[in-house]
């Protein structure tokens, strides 16, 4: 059975939504949960019927969202340090944390190390499109990149799309300010030349192409990726708020909204980041799923499902094998 370490107290809302998410996941799939935190606080939240699947790793401190990520290595008593250390010692198969994302990245990279052939890890996230989903990476691990970094991101994204998204030949694109090969800055142009080696590379793509369903994996540096991610979150929130405002304008609008309610629910679910759970940190020697600090129980549950799928798919081995084809 898969063993997953959960940073049980690192989110913005404390341990309650995290534990609720763990319990929901346990009711749906079998795995062993190692809760990292204060067991005196956590144990009363666990029902007797699920106690057999729960273990505890004591951690007396929480790495604050206000702390600098570079300080994560200094305090070995934090929940995120203890969780990552369990993975380093091979006592668990994966880590899920809704705590300080910078600390998670820093600890995972320095404590676990990088995969063979990977110079920098990348955070990957799923973005909804009109047909299914697009994998976007990097969305925050690296604000400044070299062309070789983006090439490695492309390989990792392609492998993830095949293994997890079940896309046999994922369409891979590079984010730029135009589709033409000559468009973009020096980084984009140099990266484009490297990515030509990849059979499934379809060329440059613009920001609007994320949502048309014609791209499965979109590669960019962490600065652009994070801006895109946050902008999309804001746009989605604004659109739903505008719809609510318009519905209130007349009785006919309210009737129409009532008739459209099932469709609105499907749309909201498709665009809701909580449905995707978390973002895998690709390129480190282990499975680390980084969840949003504001994750509710549903997001934590889905992040755990991601961790299970990642662990069972042997993605890291596949990434090293795929990179080996180009480095040989």
Curated annotation (Swiss-Prot):
GO annotation terms (biological process): fatty acid biosynthetic process; phospholipid biosynthetic process
InterPro entries linked to this entry: FA_synthesis, Phospholipid_synth_PlsX-like
Major location (coarse): cytoplasm
Reactions that this protein is recorded to catalyse: a fatty acyl-[ACP] + phosphate = an acyl phosphate + holo-[ACP]
Pfam families xref list: FA_synthesis
A single GO cellular-component term on record: cytoplasm
Annotated coiled-coil segments of the chain: none
Its EC number(s): 2.3.1.274
Keywords of the record: Cytoplasm, Lipid biosynthesis, Lipid metabolism, Phospholipid biosynthesis, Phospholipid metabolism, Transferase
Pathway it works in: Lipid metabolism; phospholipid metabolism
One GO MF term: phosphate:acyl-[acyl carrier protein] acyltransferase activity
Residue pairs linked by disulfide bridges in the UniProt entry: none
Function of the molecule: Catalyzes the reversible formation of acyl-phosphate (acyl-PO(4)) from acyl-[acyl-carrier-protein] (acyl-ACP). This enzyme utilizes acyl-ACP as fatty acyl donor, but not acyl-CoA.
Family per similarity comment: Belongs to the PlsX family.
PANTHER family in the record: FATTY ACID/PHOSPHOLIPID SYNTHESIS PROTEIN PLSX (PTHR30100), PHOSPHATE ACYLTRANSFERASE (PTHR30100:SF1)
Subunit details: Homodimer. Probably interacts with PlsY.
Protein's name in the database: Phosphate acyltransferase
Organism: Campylobacter jejuni subsp. jejuni serotype O:6 (strain 81116 / NCTC 11828)
